[in-house]
């Protein structure tokens, strides 16, 4: 039996080495670009969460509603069941109708994950509510998660849930 080893021409080997280098470089650049886009998207979503609370503080229900996707469904802790977009301002008006307004807040960002056109964020918020004279009426500490979807270049909330913090404030 005769064994013959067939060697590819030397140009063929050089071509494959160059191709492997090109593919490796492309993958490295693509990974970096996606990482930068993800960080940019994360920053955008956190900015929108801050805008959300500024709209609540200013009682700007129109801008607040614009943050929500038409197909939103979520479960705020003040509701006995999940709600849709047509009920998202009820908790705000329930306070303002009693003369109570969000006076201040602070957000503790805990986590965010962006995957393509979906982002999920998790945070705790401290809220101080005051009457029309500015006297503090109550403080709330709440856990919140929102699911954002990017449609037509704009992020909107499509899902969410909130609950009071536990006994240790977490």
Summary of predicted features, one role per range:
Residues 68, 125-127, 161-164:
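Short beta-strand segments enriched in hydrophobic/aromatic residues
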């Amino acid at each position: 039996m005769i064994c013959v080893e067939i060697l590819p021409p030397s140009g063929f080997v050089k071509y494959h080495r160059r191709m492997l280098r090109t593919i490796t470089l492309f993958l490295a650049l693509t990974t970096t670009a996606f990482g930068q886009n993800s960080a940019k998207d994360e920053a955008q979503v956190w900015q929108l969460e801050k805008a959300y609370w500024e709209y609540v503080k200013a009682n700007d229900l129109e801008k607040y509603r614009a943050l929500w996707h038409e197909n939103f469904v979520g479960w705020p802790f003040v509701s006995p069941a999940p709600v849709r977009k047509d009920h998202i301002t009820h908790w705000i008006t329930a306070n303002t109708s009693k003369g109570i307004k969000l006076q201040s807040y602070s957000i503790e960002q805990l986590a965010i994950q962006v995957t393509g056109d979906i982002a999920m964020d998790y945070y705790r918020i401290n809220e101080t509510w005051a009457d029309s004279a500015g006297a503090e009426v109550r403080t709330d500490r709440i856990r919140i998660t929102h699911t954002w979807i990017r449609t037509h270049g704009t992020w909107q909330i499509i899902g969410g849930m909130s609950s009071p913090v536990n006994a240790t404030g977490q």
